Each structure stands twice: as C-alpha cells, then as structure tokens.
Amino acid sequence: MEAQNQEVAALVEKIAGLHAAISKLPSLSPSAEVDALFTDLVTACVPASPVDVAKLGPEAQAMREELIRLCSAAEGHLEAHYADMLAAFDNPLDHLARFPYYGNYVNLSKLEYDLLVRYVPGIAPTRVAFVGSGPLPFSSLVLAAHHLPDAVFDNYDRCGAANERARRLFRGADEGLGARMAFHTADVATLTGELGAYDVVFLAALVGMAAEEKAGVIAHLGAHMADGAALVVRSAHGARGFLYPIVDPEDVRRGGFDVLAVCHPEDEVINSVIVARKVGAAAAAAAARRDELADSRGVVLPVVGPPSTCCKVEASAVEKAEEFAANKELSV
C-alpha cells in the first residue's frame, strides 16, 4: 500500500509540473513546445496506474479540472490546424493518416462498434447522432465507412466554424458516404424532438467537462431519446482521468438508461467506453429499485469476459442484481 501511495504521489507531482508548464504557454496552437509538453503528459497518463482521481485532495482536483480544459483547448487547436491542412487537398479523405492520432480514432471506433453489437443484440442502426463531432469528425467517418454502411449520421457541434471545417473534408468524397454525413450547429441542450429519431447516440468525451455538466447532458438525452435506443458515452479511467472527464455509470443509470457494458482499454486507446440503452419510465423505476436492493445486500458488480484483450467489461447491474436476488431466494 505504501508503495502504491508513493507511486500515486510521484505521478500527481509529475502531472502538476506539466500542468504548470502548459499553463504558462503563450498559445496552445500546435508548435514544437506545445507538442512536446502534451506528448509528455499523455506518456505519463496512459500506463496503468493505481491512482483514483476521485480521492485526490482539493488542490489536485482543481489542477486536474484545469488541465482537462487545457487539453480540450489544445485538442481543438490541433484538430482545426489539421482540418485546414487536409482541406487543401483535392480529396481530403485520401490523406486522413496525416493526422498523428488518426489510428487511435480508428481503433476507438472499432471498439465502440464491437461493444455495441455485442451488448445491444439485434441493433441495426439507420440513424445515428454524434454529439461533439468537432472539425475532424473521424469517429463518424470511420463508423460510417467501415462499420455502419447503411446509417445516416447527424453530427452536432456548438461551433459553427468546426462544422464548416468538417464539411470541407467531404469535398470530392464518395457520393454515398458524403450524402450520409450532415453537420448541425447546436448545443445538445437545445435538442429535443430530434433525439427521438436516432437508433444510437454517441457522446464525445469533452461534451460536458465537469461531472455535473456531463450528468446533465446524459439526463437530457435520457429525457428525449426513444426507448430502446443505444447511448455510447466516452469516459476515462485511472490516470487517463487527467486528460478526459470520468463518467460515473451511476449518472448514466440515473439519466434513464440501463448500463450494458463499461470498457477500460489498456492499450493506446485512451478513452473508456460506456454502452447503455434507454429504458422507459416504468423499467427505469424497477431498475432503480433492484439497484437499491442490490446495494442493501452488498452486491459487487463482477467483471465479465472482455470483447477483446484490451479492455474489461462490467456486466449490466440490472441483470446481476436480479441474478443475486434469485440465488438469495433459492438459498432461503
């Protein structure tokens, strides 16, 4: 335990030093200095770590929250820079690999698709929303081109300039792919009836950076998505929580969803993935009662078989609570 505490303390000290250096940068636009500092930060955060960011002291928590905001801003500058670079080509989609982290998006999108088809049986999406698509909508593009060829994608971002950059990438694109990608400038909080039309909604990691903001976004989606529709939420785990917000699966459940899987990759894919399904009011109330029963009996959610070697998946709380209750009754 003492060794773990020392490891966590050393990591937090290192990250605090990087935060201090990044905070002093005159600009977060791509440059040799910016790239070097964020590379060091990612290198420090990606390996498995015993750190639990929820248990950090107030000063470290404030540092972490500010660091996530800085990461978000730097990511926006980086994506805008490469979106402009790619748009200079006659067919931008032929040059996506020039973006240094394109492979990560390919792997993350494949992971999300694999989890979706495994834990939402029979799903065959025809309408998909991606909330927080940004100027480089790689996730939607990879999903549309390689995994969901029959689906139409509506991409939402609050920034009109980001959407304009995204549209330019599809100049000269295959008519089928280009026709299936639409971009809308809107805050998710203003979307109501539109959300009920989607079979799947993907929620980007940086939409709602504070825990209460993220919970509010998820609750809004739960209030307006159709019963049975799937929600895919990007989160983080361990030290990766210094780079992206961590989403509590309980906030997803409280938002009106049945959490089907929680996956924490252990490779170069930084984001964790939560797959959930919208349930009706009656089912949500019943699930809440079962969860309360499970909590009162001390049920610990087990880890079940992973869909790949890079992650661990948490089973549905509802199913496990029911299984525990059934076994308990049989033993009485």
Curated annotation (Swiss-Prot):
What family is this protein classified in?
Belongs to the nicotianamine synthase (NAS)-like family.
Q: Which gene encodes it?
A: NAS1
Which top-rank group of organisms is this from?
Answer: Eukaryota
Q: Does the keyword Iron-sulfur apply?
A: no
Q: Which InterPro entries match?
A: Nicotian_synth, SAM-dependent_MTases_sf
Q: Could you tell me the Gene Ontology terms of the biological process aspect for this record?
A: nicotianamine biosynthetic process
The record's account of tissue expression is: Expressed in roots.
**Protein name stated in the entry:** Nicotianamine synthase 1
Q: What EC number(s) is this enzyme filed under?
A: 2.5.1.43
Q: Molecular function (GO) terms listed?
A: nicotianamine synthase activity
Could you tell me what this protein does?
Synthesizes nicotianamine, a polyamine that is the first intermediate in the synthesis of the phytosiderophores of the mugineic acid type found in gramineae which serve as a sensor for the physiological iron status within the plant, and/or might be involved in the transport of iron.
Going by the record, the broad EC class of this enzyme is transferase
Gene3D superfamilies associated with the record = Vaccinia Virus protein VP39
Keywords, A to Z, come to:
S-adenosyl-L-methionine, Transferase
Q: Which reaction does it catalyse?
A: 3 S-adenosyl-L-methionine = nicotianamine + 3 S-methyl-5'-thioadenosine + 3 H(+)
What the record says about the induction of its expression is: By iron deficiency in roots and chlorotic leaves.
